[in-house]
A protein has these predicted regions:
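A short beta-strand element within the Helicase C-terminal
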Residues: 148-151, 367-380, 403-407
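A conserved SF2-helicase RecA2
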Residues: 382-422
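Conserved helix/coil segment N-terminal to the catalytic DExD/H
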Residues: 58-77, 82-101
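Substrate-gripping "pore-loop 1 plus following alpha2 helix"
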Residues: 92-93, 99, 112-125, 384-385
Length: 422
């Protein structure tokens, strides 16, 4: 879908219809657009200036941003993460760019704007009329219910679905029931209706291709979602890296050897920290949010592999909170032996149980998980055998689809070295 959009941008530019493109994508994808997708797919004859938005603007970054407003015949491309639209600085700059160009605005992984009440959704919707052309890209336009379509389609054109109000749209396509919770009467969605009609309305302005329809796809497809350290993580990470010591909540940690240091650096990148006294401290991090963004785009079931037991616990807790109790199972050292068979059976047979969270050390051997064709590596280890074995839990006899593997990587950390070594 990325190449299709870039081809569309190139065509519109060649015809003189646009001279600017604003690409909005999740945090883990923006650098891929900048470093890989545009250089690989934008035709060589198109002179362009592409700039990746950064929240902390220094003098060098400001100079790059300024090049987007220089007159000339170049195609100007601004790439921003969707979270930037939750900030005043990001909203102001995006609006300035759109007003200064004949532009196309595209939202990659557009389910990030499915919530009509979210600040970023409202900000993006408010800029809709500043662009001449609008596009959305997603691997799964309906994540949990068809109502998620409203904001995505409204960004394209508020008249596409014949509803200019979310509530009139909901009335047409959702079955509502009244529930009394804590003494309050609220409306809840209990089902859906008129979905055939909704599907017909989508067809004139959408194009959908299933992975199984792409006969030339390889058996395994690899993707990366890159994130950055939070300020708190970076402080602790840099201290560990430079001095082999880190202090968190008053606990002093020393490295015993190079392997221990690498492990502790990765733990920090993953959002937790094991002190010498054995206590584990959590650190605010971007990794868990990136995982949630990935899982929102998944159709069907997914396997999430974690290198550390703490990762499994944090991920399982967050999955249960986001997608509901019973939406996942865990399979690691902390899972009692008598519970493991139940977890496997539940994941394989229960359609509501969509996520398998485990460690390659425990779940990477001898079990079949072909009900899933998406595998996310929340964190990796250096053991190539465990990586290959864990990959093959989904990619084996019984799998009828291509399997997509997603590595979540914290940029400029030991993460990149680990994945490169694999």
């Amino acid at each position: 879908k990325t190449k299709v959009l870039i081809d569309n941008v190139a065509m519109l530019y060649d015809k003189g219809r646009i001279d600017g493109a604003l690409i909005v994508a999740p945090k883990g994808v923006v650098s891929t657009w900048y470093k890989q997708e545009l250089p690989a797919h934008l035709p060589d004859h198109i002179e362009n200036v592409a700039v990746l938005w950064q929240a902390n603007i220094n003098k060098k970054q400001q100079e790059k941003l300024d090049t987007l407003f220089k007159t000339g015949h170049d195609l100007h491309i601004l790439i921003m993460n969707v979270e930037a639209f939750s900030t005043e600085k990001g909203r102001i700059f995006a609006a300035k760019f759109l007003r200064s160009h004949k532009s196309l605005m595209a939202i990659d992984e557009s389910t990030t704007i499915k919530n009509p009440k979210a600040k970023r959704t409202k900000a993006i919707e408010s800029m809709r009329t500043l662009s001449l052309y609008r596009r959305i890209l997603t691997g799964s336009p309906v994540t949990r219910n068809p109502l998620d379509l409203y904001s995505q389609c409204e960004f394209l054109d508020p008249y596409h679905l014949d509803h200019t109000s979310y509530y009139s749209f909901r009335t047409r396509y959702a079955v509502m029931r009244t529930a009394n919770i804590a003494g309050r009467s609220i409306q809840l969605v209990s089902g859906f209706k008129n979905l055939g009609e909704l599907s017909d309305k989508l067809k004139p302005f959408s194009y959908r291709v299933l992975k199984e329809d792409c006969l030339d796809l390889p058996g395994k497809i690899y993707m990366k979602r890159e994130i950055t350290l939070t300020p708190e993580q970076k402080k602790v990470y840099d201290e560990m890296k430079q001095t082999a010591l880190a202090t968190l909540n008053g606990k002093r940690v020393t490295t015993v050897n190079a392997l221990t240091q690498l492990m502790r650096l990765q733990q920090i990148a993953c959002g937790h920290f094991t002190a010498d006294d054995g206590s584990i401290q959590n650190i605010k991090n971007n990794r868990i949010e990136e995982l949630m963004d990935v899982l929102e785009e998944v159709e069907g079931k997914a396997i999430i592999w974690c290198h550390y037991q703490r990762d499994v616990e944090n991920v399982f807790e967050r999955v249960s909170k986001r997608f509901g109790p019973g939406s996942g199972v865990h399979y690691y050292g902390g899972t009692l032996p008598e519970e493991r068979d139940k977890a496997l059976k539940n994941f394989k047979e229960n359609p509501d149980c969509r996520f398998f969270v485990g460690t390659p050390a425990t779940g990477g051997y001898g079990i079949t998980l072909t009900v899933a064709n998406t595998v996310v590596y929340y964190s990796n280890g250096y053991d190539l055998e465990k990586r290959m074995q864990s990959e093959d839990r989904a990619h084996r006899i019984g799998q009828k689809k291509s399997v997509t593997y997603v590595d979540i990587i914290t940029d400029d950390t030991v993460d990149t070295k680990i994945v490169k070594s694999l």
